[in-house]
């Protein structure tokens, strides 16, 4: 059999992690496989020949995208031309749908097999994107089971491979060891996780600290940990802490240690809610957006829930306090009983963890190779 050539494109750090795991699993089955495309340091370490730095694709927010649109479109056009000339056996677009779905469509029209790894949130909003996916994608690989059901209903070939986080996070976290590592003793501990982006922390940081002050009056001896995504976020939080007397430890990164150590979490909606679920920590989910953005999204979003635990459970498993409902008083009052006993939430968390724990990288590799069995 001729040497297998796999093209991959990842647009951000989370895609680099997924891509490197998939590449490792493919190499275990085809040691001489050749990898081309765009990826980060982890994918390059697995042998990817990256055409340009992945950072050029990692753009957040509408305004930033508009500022770089000409460059992004030029890079995409050149990438499509290069890949059509190279004729890989398969192209795998990892997340970054606004960049990769168009590549998949053009390559499939040129006779190259295409796979999309990580579903965009088409089940929640901009559902018409599924038409583009159906046209441009030979196979969709989803991390979550409800996504796979959506694609089956839409007639898109799909495989639910499980979530890599569910593979790496243990079914039972060692709370005493995590507390010892962070210098925390006995007594109730609450993790505050207001997000990793500047805008999120700007909208939620002070609110979460206000809620923590209220919670201190309701739960005797409670302490708080707040993992900061980077030095900029830490400086932002430190400014908000001026003049407050909170028993709070700021951490640099270490969000997984914070989740392992705590009894409950006050958390921004996002991927971190899945991490909290996998650590079996009861949570209250909060989110605030700019008023106009919230008004628009409220009309676009088709899903009754915003947090991953509720989407996975298909019911309100964890409280969601959004926009004007997210007051410091409401957050503290909702969180206080969960610090004492959150077992009603966490029993279901264990069941969900086991559903998602499927050895995702190997499942994804098997699905890709099954697509190529007749090459």
From Swiss-Prot:
Enumerate the Gene Ontology biological process terms: lipid A biosynthetic process
Cellular component, GO annotation: membrane
The reaction(s) annotated as catalysed by this protein in its Swiss-Prot or TrEMBL entry are:
a lipid X + a UDP-2-N,3-O-bis[(3R)-3-hydroxyacyl]-alpha-D-glucosamine = a lipid A disaccharide + UDP + H(+)
Q: Which GO terms describe its molecular function?
A: lipid-A-disaccharide synthase activity; phospholipid binding
Broad EC category: transferase
Q: Which terms are listed as keywords in the entry? A: Glycosyltransferase, Lipid A biosynthesis, Lipid biosynthesis, Lipid metabolism, Transferase
UniProt EC number: 2.4.1.182
User: Its annotated pathway?
Assistant: Bacterial outer membrane biogenesis; LPS lipid A biosynthesis
Checking Pfam families in the record gives:
LpxB
> Which PANTHER family does the record match to this protein?
LIPID-A-DISACCHARIDE SYNTHASE (PTHR30372), LIPID-A-DISACCHARIDE SYNTHASE, MITOCHONDRIAL-RELATED (PTHR30372:SF4)
What does the sequence similarity comment in the record state about its family?
Belongs to the LpxB family.
**What's this chain's function?**
Condensation of UDP-2,3-diacylglucosamine and 2,3-diacylglucosamine-1-phosphate to form lipid A disaccharide, a precursor of lipid A, a phosphorylated glycolipid that anchors the lipopolysaccharide to the outer membrane of the cell.
Q: What is this protein called?
A: Lipid-A-disaccharide synthase
Q: Which organism is it from?
A: Pseudomonas putida (strain ATCC 47054 / DSM 6125 / CFBP 8728 / NCIMB 11950 / KT2440)
What gene is behind this protein? lpxB
């Amino acid at each position: 059999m001729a040497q297998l050539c796999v093209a991959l494109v990842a647009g951000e750090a989370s895609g680099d992690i997924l891509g490197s795991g998939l590449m490792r699993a493919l190499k275990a089955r085809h040691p001489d496989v050749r990898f081309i495309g765009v990826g980060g340091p982890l994918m390059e370490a697995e042998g990817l020949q990256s055409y340009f730095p992945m950072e050029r694709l990692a753009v957040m927010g509408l305004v930033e995208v508009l500022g770089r649109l000409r460059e992004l479109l030029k890079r995409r056009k050149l990438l499509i031309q290069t890949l059509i000339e190279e004729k890989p056996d398969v192209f795998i677009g990892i997340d970054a749908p606004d960049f990769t779905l168009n590549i998949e469509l053009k390559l499939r029209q040129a006779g190259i097999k295409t796979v999309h790894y990580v579903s965009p949130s088409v089940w929640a909003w901009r559902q018409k994107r599924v038409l583009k996916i159906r046209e441009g994608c030979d196979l969709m690989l989803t991390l979550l089971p409800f996504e796979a059901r959506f694609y089956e209903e839409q007639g898109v070939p799909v495989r639910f491979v499980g979530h890599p986080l569910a593979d790496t996070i243990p079914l039972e976290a060692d709370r005493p060891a995590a507390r010892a590592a962070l210098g925390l003793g006995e007594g109730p501990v609450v993790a505050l996780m207001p997000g990793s982006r500047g805008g999120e922390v700007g909208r939620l940081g002070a609110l979460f600290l206000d809620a923590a002050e209220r919670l201190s009056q309701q739960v005797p001896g409670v302490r708080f940990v707040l993992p900061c995504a980077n030095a900029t976020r830490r400086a932002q939080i430190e400014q908000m802490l001026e003049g407050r007397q909170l028993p709070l430890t700021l951490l640099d990164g270490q969000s997984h240690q914070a989740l392992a150590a705590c009894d409950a979490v006050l958390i921004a909606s996002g991927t971190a809610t899945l991490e909290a679920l996998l650590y079996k920590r009861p949570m209250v989910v909060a989110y605030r957006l700019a008023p106009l953005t919230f008004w628009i999204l409220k009309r676009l979003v088709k899903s009754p829930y915003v947090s991953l635990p509720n989407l996975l459970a298909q019911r309100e498993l964890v409280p969601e306090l959004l926009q004007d409902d997210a007051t410091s008083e409401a957050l503290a009052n909702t969180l206080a009983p969960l610090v004492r006993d959150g077992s009603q939430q966490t029993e279901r968390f264990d069941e969900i963890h086991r559903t998602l724990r499927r050895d995702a990288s190997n499942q994804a590799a098997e699905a890709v190779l099954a697509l190529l069995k007749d090459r």
